[in-house]
Amino acid sequence: MMMIAPSKMSAQEDNGFKKFSVEEAFEDNGFQWFRDAQLLCAGNKEKSNAMTIGWGGIGTLWQRPALTVYVAEQRFTQKFMDDSEYFTVMSFDVKDSKVLNYMGTKSGRDGDKAQALGLHTAYTANGTPYYTEATMVIECKIMYAAPFDPQYFKSDVPKNMYGNFTAGVHSMYIGEVVNAWKK
């Protein structure tokens, strides 16, 4: 009798996630999704950082599924984004709003925010960090990164925004969606 060994489950499946295609099964409103706040994480197994984000976009660019995020120059996470090849964006259940609130008001410069919240860090096959408490994880490979250049602002909206914003001009990171999982 021939025995077939069970296939090795991915770390994400071990943590209750199922892989899905953002192009076929992303059910959230792309305009509202970032307004509801998501968690951005970058780094590696030695050191990572996450922050709450409310700006972003999801769609298609260069014939690839793409996700765009923005990080201000004085944010601790920006160095992790600049030094990383991949990043994750995570959704959390509404009842976990303390996670998004804390990650959005505390700096990783002052301590390990994930540890302070009791979050469990796991890693994708690419080594990208995510938290097992998330309800959805989208992993992206950075295709483009650049800071906004104020000389190209064409309306008063960004001019007025940055006139009172102490964290500096944002950098834009466009990532190709390479993996997505949800619970």
What positions do the PLM features span?
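Basic, polyanion-binding surface patches
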Residues: 10-183
